[in-house]
Amino acid sequence: MQVLPPSSTGGPSRLFIMRPVATTLLMVAILLAGIIGYRALPVSALPEVDYPTIQVVTLYPGASPDVMTSAVTAPLERQFGQMSGLKQMSSQSSGGASVITLQFQLTLPLDVAEQEVQAAINAATNLLPSDLPNPPVYSKVNPADPPIMTLAVTSTAMPMTQVEDMVETRVAQKISQISGVGLVTLSGGQRPAVRVKLNAQAIAALGLTSETVRTAITGANVNSAKGSLDGPSRAVTLSANDQMQSAEEYRQLIIAYQNGAPIRLGDVATVEQGAENSWLGAWANKEQAIVMNVQRQPGANIISTADSIRQMLPQLTESLPKSVKVTVLSDRTTNIRASVDDTQFELMMAIALVVMIIYLFLRNIPATIIPGVAVPLSLIGTFAVMVFLDFSINNLTLMALTIATGFVVDDAIVVIENISRYIEKGEKPLAAALKGAGEIGFTIISLTFSLIAVLIPLLFMGDIVGRLFREFAITLAVAILISAVVSLTLTPMMCARMLSQESLRKQNRFSRASEKMFDRIIAAYGRGLAKVLNHPWLTLSVALSTLLLSVLLWVFIPKGFFPVQDNGIIQGTLQAPQSSSFANMAQRQRQVADVILQDPAVQSLTSFVGVDGTNPSLNSARLQINLKPLDERDDRVQKVIARLQTAVDKVPGVDLFLQPTQDLTIDTQVSRTQYQFTLQATSLDALSTWVPQLMEKLQQLPQLSDVSSDWQDKGLVAYVNVDRDSASRLGISMADVDNALYNAFGQRLISTIYTQANQYRVVLEHNTENTPGLAALDTIRLTSSDGGVVPLSSIAKIEQRFAPLSINHLDQFPVTTISFNVPDNYSLGDAVQAIMDTEKTLNLPVDITTQFQGSTLAFQSALGSTVWLIVAAVVAMYIVLGILYESFIHPITILSTLPTAGVGALLALMIAGSELDVIAIIGIILLIGIVKKNAIMMIDFALAAEREQGMSPRDAIYQACLLRFRPILMTTLAALLGALPLMLSTGVGAELRRPLGIGMVGGLIVSQVLTLFTTPVIYLLFDRLALWTKSRFARHEEEA
């Protein structure tokens, strides 16, 4: 038996080539594991990002923003500020509501953060108002994971209070029990209650006050322990009729006696079943509704969760009265399914294009089948690893697999092409497989590890962006690694069994024509390369020019954060004059809804009015506009927004701010627009001075649009200026005054009704239907120390003033948020720079600090780390290549190809009108790993020719370029066609995928043309440099 030379022994591939059955079964195992993994993987829009954010909501009906700030928000903030791991704390104190948002470091587990928050709330309990209806409630908030579904419950016959009760006790609980559902929240504020509306004149005529009534009600409705009787033979539990359940029972309550006759509550008040808060409301289209937002559990399959909800809806509807209707207003899975389907189609298209290009070059069906098996096997096998890593099928992981299509086929192409070359020379298929695989094994390892090295810096990206792209980078790395394994095992084994001289020599008309064409191309390339090698300095100047051009393009290209997606949902904020009441705002909201629902692209509309912890004031409303599916409307979301804003501008007295809802949401608070900028000061007075000046400047900038701020300091206040001396003489305290006002105008929750299913409140207020506005204050009566009734007007004057509608804090200091959008002809980078320049012209005092927030802050962070990220990728690849080649020089030759890729990518983005955003930057980093393959294949063969055949460096690199021209062209076109479907994507989520494809296609085209000529020249330059260095060292040693 002939003994094969070392390169012919097959290296690590020999065992697999010689044992085809074992190799086949191993690959089948990988295939089956991948298929099982694919079926087990959850589906989502983006990778799971557990963003440790907790929101603490405290409701105190009737309290002014100032009282909420000092009595509720400030004590809680002081306790929260002592927690470790807290990254940022923001708060919003408005009329009756305090919302504190706690954002923790990404490294802090959410359960630990919850424990710290609960401990801080417990520590602050004694500092909070004693009459707070409910303690602060905290909930986990993940801004990166919005609700998966929004449902509306309406009725044509039942009052909304009964609908709310039914939804809360039956519908919401059933949906919460579905596997995968994490939280169901209700909006609409129509919780049932008994409302007691006092007739101020009636109680005054009887010598009573509202405090007398409140005391009577709270004493008459209790629910406390009563004990039990334990006798010699039996035990008896004690119970009593201490609870009043209905409005009728409260009407009959005796609150006082006068001249021996009972005075019942119904004599001095209107008692009725109503809503706990009459200043809250939600609408679905034009109908008042109870709206349910459903959020999934972390890691749950969003598709199966939504399907389970839809399957349960018919059963839930049957259990409800016929007049009650449950409607799905929005379902995120509709767009997620479409986006994932489009990405999967692009993945299949990429595979088909890659196989087509392989056949075009190899012109042989058996040779085409081999990579046609290797590519899907590598991709499917990746799913098995993804399951163990708790990944999901999402847009980014599918993008990684689509890009991997062009990567993984490279290894198979290089192996097949090398083995085919030996078969064409007359080698037997088995010997050719052993020799070709052994010869190319080191190249495959070099290609694989140098490409994976490029992805390593992505794993160390900070903040939420790094968490997001971790799955992308690891998925791509796993696919590349499996591809290398397949290419060194299955591919040479199949070559040994499927390829032969006859099959390779068998040619049809297409084969002969394409062969002649490739021969002519290679001959032309050889002539061109010879000329280039004869003029190395001209070629070097071209290479240096690309480096300079790439730097210039990097500086001047518009920069952004993430592409704006069209997910079919628009989030809106409606703003009215600061003195607007709930009724006035509800009317304006209905006018705007009528206009919006007339747009042909709008499918449904949800709107909310009232202070509920999300809405900061009565003069604002929230809207969620659900658009028709993309294939059922003519325009993308940005055009629809522009059209809606133009239409709503005709409605007097309102301003509408719209922004498309995104899969990636970093902002922890509801904002009017996409981007935010904050001014923070030590006092509200400083903000009142500088906010208007900055707003005036910013509204004039062409780089910004829809500029607004949450600074609202013109809210109407009726200031009760009490003459303390007069009040003291009458024995009336300030607590008496506050209680009287709270009883009358605060929708005061004074008692609780307990049932087997739920708890309901008793609400006390004055009936102000006949005395609207400030005149209602004239009806307030207080009790003096001698039992007499004293009008409030006799001891106090009412002054009209202005005050903030809400008070916002950032890390315990007053703050104002300025919101803005970016016009189509500008980038976020332009807007950020314009704001910073404007800030410098104002010369703000030292006690005012500014900071970007949300997406804008993340953009600044990502932009600042981008250059270092690319440098880290280059350094990582240099280290890996240096180790593999045991050389300091050859890695530099390989890395010299990178500027050409940068020029191509940046030029393509500018021509396509795309910004240099995070997605495009990922594409450029991937290009770093792709384009160096050309140089690796050239240099490997050149070094082998010098070492084994004794060729000169010039002849060696010239021969290497000609021999590797076809696989270089094949691998580059394969990578290009793998990215082409992303570049041409037009479906749902295309905005996220397209920049990656554009950058990669542009970079590959330019680098392919230039590196075929610049790499050989640089190789020879460094070879001469190495010889010169060695001679200098040798001379020094001789002299020594």
Swiss-Prot record:
Induction, as annotated: The mdtABC operon is transcriptionally activated by BaeR.
Keyword Nucleotide-binding applies: no
Keywords: Cell inner membrane, Cell membrane, Membrane, Transmembrane, Transmembrane helix, Transport
SUPFAM superfamilies tied to this protein: Multidrug efflux transporter AcrB pore domain, PN1, PN2, PC1 and PC2 subdomains, Multidrug efflux transporter AcrB TolC docking domain, DN and DC subdomains, Multidrug efflux transporter AcrB transmembrane domain
Record membrane topology: Multi-pass membrane protein
Subcellular location: Cell inner membrane
GO cellular component: plasma membrane
GO molecular-function term, one example from the UniProt record: xenobiotic transmembrane transporter activity
Nucleotide-binding among keywords: no
Transmembrane segments: 16-36, 347-367, 369-389, 396-416, 440-460, 472-492, 537-557, 863-883, 888-908, 911-931, 968-988, 998-1018
Function: The MdtABC tripartite complex confers resistance against novobiocin and deoxycholate.
Family: Belongs to the resistance-nodulation-cell division (RND) (TC 2.A.6) family. MdtB subfamily.
Record note on quaternary structure: Part of a tripartite efflux system composed of MdtA, MdtB and MdtC. MdtB forms a heteromultimer with MdtC.
Protein name: Multidrug resistance protein MdtB
Species this protein is from: Escherichia coli O139:H28 (strain E24377A / ETEC)
Lineage of origin: Bacteria, Pseudomonadati, Pseudomonadota, Gammaproteobacteria, Enterobacterales
